[in-house]
């Protein structure tokens, strides 16, 4: 699906820019990658498995994007991926997992946190030098669960709360390098991860009844926020956690 938000900005706003979308092979990450590609950027996406890369290869929205397999738990793999990119203007962290119902197990909890939070820190640290050279920016993916708890997903909730605080901390730490660090905080977005909830009429209705804009969000809605945060229009914006949730948090 084309992203209508791309037309909000000057044509080819991101021409000459290299964007790395970690976890950009599907869902919100793919929506963000497709939007930047449509806006003229060179985009590289990563996935954790060969199957992820196959999905990306079959997505027409990602046509023209390069890709590689990276497990964000592997510091060496993360650094090799970033070292292979000559120049980098924007790092976008979308890699994440959610294991509903099993995250009360400490081992599962630790795995989720290692991917969602520690993985975000690994990519930020590995990208710092290249982003310093370009005076670029980082966009992390927080969540509405950065703001409230989730009894079935304590690992996911803790990791996304951590991403929020990490974003604020790195915004301060990296400011002297000319690097801005922000995050999007998606609400209920229609992706494969939320497919079970979308298919359950009673649960979907409960979500929509609390959402003032009364619809499920789409990956391109989150992409619109990312296009702004990476743009010159946001040159004085750093340390922000931007909800993209149709008003869910304020209702």
Where are these regions (language model features)?
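Short C-terminal tail/terminal secondary-structure segment
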Residues: 2-10, 148, 227, 238-251
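Short, small/polar-rich loop/turn modules that mediate ligand/substrate recognition or access, typified
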Residues: 175, 180, 237-239
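Conserved NAD(P)H cofactor-binding loop of Rossmann-fold oxidoreductase domains
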Residues: 94-99, 247
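Residue(s) in the substrate-gating loop at a strand-loop-helix junction
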Residues: 143
């Amino acid at each position: 699906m084309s992203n209508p938000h791309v037309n909000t900005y000057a044509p080819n706003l991101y021409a000459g820019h290299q964007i790395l979308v970690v976890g950009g092979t599907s869902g919100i990450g793919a929506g963000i990658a497709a939007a930047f590609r449509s806006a003229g950027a060179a985009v590289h996406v990563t996935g954790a498995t060969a199957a992820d890369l196959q999905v990306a290869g079959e997505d027409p929205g990602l046509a023209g994007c390069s890709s590689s397999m990276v497990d964000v738990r592997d510091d060496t793999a993360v650094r090799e991926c970033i070292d292979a990119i000559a120049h980098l203007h924007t790092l976008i962290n979308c890699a994440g997992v959610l294991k509903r119902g099993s995250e009360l197990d400490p081992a599962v909890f630790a795995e989720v946190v290692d991917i969602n939070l520690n993985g975000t820190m690994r990519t930020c640290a590995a990208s710092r030098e290249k982003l310093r050279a370009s005076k670029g920016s980082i966009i992390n993916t927080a969540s509405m669960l950065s703001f409230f708890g989730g009894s079935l997903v304590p690992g996911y909730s803790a990791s996304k709360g951590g991403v929020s605080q990490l974003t604020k901390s790195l915004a301060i730490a990296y400011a002297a390098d000319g690097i801005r660090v922000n995050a999007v905080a998606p609400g209920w977005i229609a992706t494969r991860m939320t497919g079970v909830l979308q298919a359950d009429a009673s649960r979907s209705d409960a979500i929509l009844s609390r959402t003032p804009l009364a619809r499920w969000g789409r990956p391109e809605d989150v992409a619109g926020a990312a296009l702004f945060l990476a743009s010159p229009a946001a040159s004085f914006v750093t340390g922000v956690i931007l909800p993209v949730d149709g008003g869910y948090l304020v209702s």
